[in-house]
Amino acid sequence: MAQHGALETLKDLAEKEVDDAARLLGEMRRGCQQAEEQLKMLIDYQNEYRSNLNTDMGNGIASNRWINYQQFIQTLEKAIEQHRLQLTQWTQKVDLALKSWREKKQRLQAWQTLQDRQTAAALLAENRMDQKKMDEFAQRAAMRKPE
């Protein structure tokens, strides 16, 4: 029974690890999604700003305003590049969290399999014991029966 309790405890710990890994994976995916949304917003803003620049250039633009546009676009490009790096980092975090979750899930399944085998072995032993008792009872009953 102590072994059964130990297996149960190990399986419970593995379940907790799987739950914790799933929570972490969810957090990493949310972070990655937010980084994707921020990057998209920056790219959209950059495209809109460039469109405004093209419109203003078509209508004529002062050189100092054109310089301001260029500087701001360069700043946006740097921000976009930084967000791309952040997105890459978030993607790596998601991949690691997913790998960890899969490993923990596999470990849990191994513990579950061991527990199932142990339960089946205990049931088989119990059935054999019952069969042995029934055979002994039948044998004693046959010996008492007068012929």
UniProtKB/Swiss-Prot annotation:
Name of the molecule in the record: Flagellar FliJ protein
Protein function: Flagellar protein that affects chemotactic events.
Protein localization: Cell membrane
GO biological process: bacterial-type flagellum organization; bacterial-type flagellum-dependent cell motility; chemotaxis; protein transport
Family from the record: Belongs to the FliJ family.
Key word Protein transport present: yes
Keywords, alphabetical: Bacterial flagellum biogenesis, Bacterial flagellum protein export, Cell membrane, Chemotaxis, Membrane, Protein transport, Transport
Xref: InterPro entries: Flag_assembly_chemotaxis_eff, Flag_FliJ_proteobac, Flagell_FliJ, FliJ
Gene name per UniProt: fliJ
Key word Nuclease present: no
Membrane topology: Peripheral membrane protein
NCBIfam families (alphabetical): flagell_FliJ
Top-level taxon: Bacteria
GO CC terms, sorted: bacterial-type flagellum; plasma membrane
GO molecular function per UniProt: cytoskeletal motor activity
